[in-house]
Amino acid sequence: MKKIMWLILLLVLTSILNGCAKEETKEVIGIRGEIKEIYLSEDGTTIAGILVEGEIQEDTMYDSASVRIDENTVVYKGEEEGTIEDLEEGLIVEIIFDGPVAESYPVQGLAKEIKILED
């Protein structure tokens, strides 16, 4: 009887430890589309956000997004790192959001990464 109890306890502990293991999560592209509008900060000196519109594709989640940009947002031009100042209306970009988005229309969220696909 004791052996069965130990076996059950071992199985339960193994299940708990497996459930607590960190899984690697692949970052999901929130939206891929064209920058339609650029929002400036209150003082008008920096880009605070962009409006991106595209189509929902197999690897994207949204077709329209109001994207906030902060000092932690990383911008890439192709494979090289760019700057927020590289963003212009008409560019095609991919957005990876940082955390949850507000499920309004368009969705609203903070950009973790912006990748410029075309000039």
Predicted features and spans:
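Beta-strand/loop nucleic-acid-binding surfaces
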Residues: Y62-E81
